[in-house]
Amino acid sequence: EGTEEEEERYNNRAPIYAEFAKIVCISVVARNKDDSIKKISFCGDDEKQILSDFFQLLNSAPMANLGGHNVKAFDIPFLCKRAIINSLKIPKVLDYGTYPAWKMDLVRDTMELRKRSAFLSTSLELIASCLDLPSPKSIMNGAEVSSIYWESLNNAEWHQQKLMEIKDYCE
């Protein structure tokens, strides 16, 4: 049996390890044929269904590029590990192993772009602020998502409200 300090450390760190986590929301932004932008979110309690629906979108959409903040180092490996744990086939666009090195430019990562500056890392919040873009990251931060989700499970109505807050954060 662990100490209270060990338990707190586990609760704070485990959600960022795919082996111990659970995906409850995936949000993406897609460009329509008329160049308008739309948000698409997959959110709920069934992680395998969320991943399946997201992968179906990736497999069916003629995407030239994927993009995100720290997406190459965190999001894509995390999604792939959770896919394996859920016995799902990883979509080709996420499977780095299927691409030759010269085709990795299909994934744009703002963290990599910022690493070319004097600072080694830059938060998504700072990038959004510099570009004068709104950021929902003020609602909560990534470290809070796990506890908000798990603590809301005891009350169905509150749980749905918290899932929508997590969705807003992800978008």
Predicted regions and their residues:
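Short, flexible loop segments at the rims of nucleotide/cofactor-binding pockets, characterized by
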Residues: 41-46
